[in-house]
Each structure stands twice: as structure tokens, then as C-alpha cells.
Amino acid sequence: MIQVAMKLSQQLRLGEHRCDVIIAITHCRLPNDVKIANALGAVANTDPSKNGVDLILGGHDHEYYIGRGIESYEGSDFDTEMPGSENDENSFIIKSGTDFHDLSAVEITLSEPHPPTAVRRRTIEHVKGMYNVLTRF
């Protein structure tokens, strides 16, 4: 998955689309999302000279997880020490619950444009989120 994401990142950033930001939507277990985030630079203070993704919106686990790189998260307290998160290197990961019972609103702040030699024209400086409950049983 990492190799495919890297290839797509190169196409999206350097090809005809010239994307400033890439948001990956995954359906992985938390340890895999953490591994992907670390490998592809979906972390705070990422290197703008490297390809990769900027933010991961994850599913599959049916649990809420907020990566350690997320600056603030309103609406509830979440444990960033969940099993499978041990290797989280300040990731920009949001795993937003289960079966559309919960919803995350996400606000990202981008850097000023990087020099033309950078692969990532902009990087994420801050991520803020808000937890919303849609339904309760």
C-alpha cells in the first residue's frame, strides 16, 4: 500500500494535477495507518522535499483515534495511547468512529508556499478537529 500511495503521490503532485495537499482515505487497522503515516510523511513538521500524503482519514477499526500530530480536538477526550499507536510519530491521522454514528469536522492550516524546488508546494502546519455525535443507541 505504501508503494502505491507513493506512486500516486508523485503523479498527483508532479503530474498534470499539481496538487498542493493529498488526503488519503484508508480502511486499515490503526497500526497500518500509523505505519503509512510515518512512511509517507503524514506527520507534523514533514519534509517538503519528499513525496507522500499529508493527512489520513482512516476507517476499519470502528474506534475514534486522533494522531499525536493533531493540535487540538474538541468535543471529547481521546486516548492517543491506543493499542497499535506505539509508533505514532506525531501523525496526522483521524479515525472517526463507526457506522456514521460520529462525525469529525477537520480544519487544516497550510504553510506558505515552499520554494519551487520543493516537492510539496505546501505542508500542513496545524490540524484541529471537532467531534460530533450524530446518533446514539
Role assignments for model-derived ranges:
Residues A5-D33:
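Short acidic, glycine-rich surface-loop motifs adjacent to enzyme active sites
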Residues M1-M6, E125:
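Cap/lid and interdomain-hinge subdomains that line or gate substrate/regulatory clefts
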